[in-house]
């Protein structure tokens, strides 16, 4: 199996370490990777947010599976991009679609989801720089 792992953090290092142990692995590419990931596969200069570049790499290198580590490509819709592309839709990409990724990528979205579905969670409110005074009041009320 030929695997492309997107990301450059500690999470991706752990993924690379474990994937490299598989007897099914033919090649592991990590984009962009880090000093630790290079011990387990080949780091490549590829921006995980450049979906067209990811597509080209997947097709040119006969990638069988893509694993997305960081939230940002998922929140920006890389899974949706793969599923809507006729050349990529049969290449498994591990990670949620854009809407599902919002649960991790947006705390405001996640909290609203939890309240809407009666999932126990701590009290919260969302503030901006324009409503900072309201934020201070909210925090004072939490004491």
Enumerate the predicted regions with their spans.
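Active-site nucleotide/adenylate-binding loops and adjacent lid/helix of ATP-dependent enzymes
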Residues: 4-5, 90, 105-143
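Short, small-residue-enriched loops and turns at beta-alpha junctions
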Residues: 100-104
């Amino acid at each position: 199996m030929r695997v492309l792992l997107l990301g450059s953090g500690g999470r991706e290092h752990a993924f690379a370490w474990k994937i490299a142990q598989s007897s099914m692995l033919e090649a592991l590419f990590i984009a962009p990777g880090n000093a630790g990931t290079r011990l387990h596969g080949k780091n490549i200069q590829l921006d995980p947010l450049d979906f067209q570049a990811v597509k080209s790499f997947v097709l040119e290198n006969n990638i069988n599976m893509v694993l997305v580590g960081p939230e940002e490509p998922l929140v920006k819709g890389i899974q949706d991009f793969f599923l809507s592309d006729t050349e990529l839709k049969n290449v498994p990409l591990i990670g949620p679609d854009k809407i599902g990724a919002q649960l991790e990528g947006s705390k405001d979205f996640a909290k609203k989801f939890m309240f809407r579905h009666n999932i126990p969670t701590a009290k919260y409110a969302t503030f901006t720089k324009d409503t900072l005074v309201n934020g201070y009041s909210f925090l004072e009320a939490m004491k």
